């Protein structure tokens, strides 16, 4: 599991809870069985990237910094992993992989990569959270 996966899970958790009530990071860590200090570092990055707000004090915690309809998967992934490189990386690791000089998988990988980017920039957090809730209900009967 990578850091951006955990960030997405934590953001879904925040989208599922009351937006005006801060949630303790320990609670999210316990819910997903993530080491607290590891999640705290991830959340610190999300605060710096202005995706969540940290509230200090006895009733403090973290909450979404903006409407979950305006947060997309790519916002979360890029906040944690950084922006994708300007020059596309080859799926098989070759130095040169372009339409003019393709690797053996270039033609198959290019549409998948495009579709993945499209999905990540069009799937808002609120829809993702609703779908996760539905799936949990189906799984739990």
Where are these regions (language model features)?
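Short amphipathic alpha-helical interface segments
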Residues: 10-19
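A short alpha-helical element within helix-turn-helix/winged-helix DNA-binding domains
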Residues: 26-32
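Beta-hairpin "wing" of winged helix-turn-helix
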Residues: 50-64
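C-terminal regulatory/oligomerization modules of transcriptional regulators
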Residues: 72, 86, 91-141
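Short, hydrophobic-biased segments on the C-terminal half of alpha helices
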Residues: 43-44
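Alpha-helical residues within the helix-turn-helix
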Residues: 30, 47-48
């Amino acid at each position: 599991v990578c850091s951006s996966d955990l960030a997405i899970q934590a953001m879904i958790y925040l989208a599922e809870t009351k937006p005006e009530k801060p949630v303790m990071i320990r609670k999210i860590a316990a819910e997903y069985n993530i080491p607290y200090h590891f999640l705290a570092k991830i959340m610190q990055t999300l605060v710096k990237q202005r995706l969540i707000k940290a509230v200090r004090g006895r009733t403090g915690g973290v909450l979404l910094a903006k409407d979950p309809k305006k947060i997309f998967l790519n916002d979360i992934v890029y906040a944690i992993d950084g922006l994708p490189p300007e020059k596309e990386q080859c799926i098989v690791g070759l130095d040169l992989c372009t339409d003019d000089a393709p690797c053996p998988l270039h033609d198959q990988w290019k549409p998948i990569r495009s579709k993945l980017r499209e999905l990540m920039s069009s799937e808002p957090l609120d829809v993702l959270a609703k779908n996760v809730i539905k799936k949990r209900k189906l799984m739990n009967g």
